[in-house]
UniProtKB/Swiss-Prot annotation:
Subunit-level organization: Homodimer, probably forms a complex with cognate antitoxin AF_2432.
GO MF annotations, alphabetized: nucleotide binding; RNA nuclease activity
InterPro entries for this protein: HepT-like, HepT-like_sf, Type_VII_TA_RNase
Gene Ontology CC terms: toxin-antitoxin complex
Organism: Archaeoglobus fulgidus (strain ATCC 49558 / DSM 4304 / JCM 9628 / NBRC 100126 / VC-16)
Keyword Phosphoprotein appears in the UniProt entry: yes
Function comment: Probable toxic component of a putative type VII toxin-antitoxin (TA) system, probably an RNase. Probably neutralized by cognate antitoxin AF_2432. Neutralization may be due to AMPylation by AF_2432.
PTM annotation (O-di-AMP-tyrosine): residues: Y97
Protein name, per record: Putative RNase AF_2433
Amino acid sequence: MRRERYLEKIEYIVEALSEIPERVKTPIEVSGVFYNLLTSIESAMDISAMLVKDLGGRVEDDYSNVEMLKELGIIDEELAEGLKKCNGLRNWLVHRYNRVDKELVLSSVEEVKALLLKFIQRVEDVLEKIEP
C-alpha cells in the first residue's frame, strides 16, 4: 500500500485545519478559511479514492467512494453522511465561490474539522491493520 502518500495527505489535512483561525476579520482571512476547508475536504476525498482502490474496489465519484467505504465497514453511516456533506460544501465553494453564504460556511468550520479528524483516525486505524 502507499502508506507514505496517505500520511502526506493526512498531514496536509491536519496542518490546513489547524491554520484556520477561530475568528476571521478580513476578506483575505475568509478566503484563507475557504481555501483550507476546500483543500482539506479534497484531500479527504483523495484518501477515500485511494482506500477504495487499495482495498480492491472500483474508484468512482467522491460520493460513491464514501459509500463504498461504508459498505466495506471502514466508516459508519454517520461519518459517511458527514463526509458527503463536506464534499457538497467543497463543491459549493468551488463552483459558486462568488455567491457563497460566508456566514454559513464559517459556522460549519468546527463541524467539518471534527468530521475530517474522525475520518483521519479511521484511516490511520485501517493503515495500522493493513501495514502495522
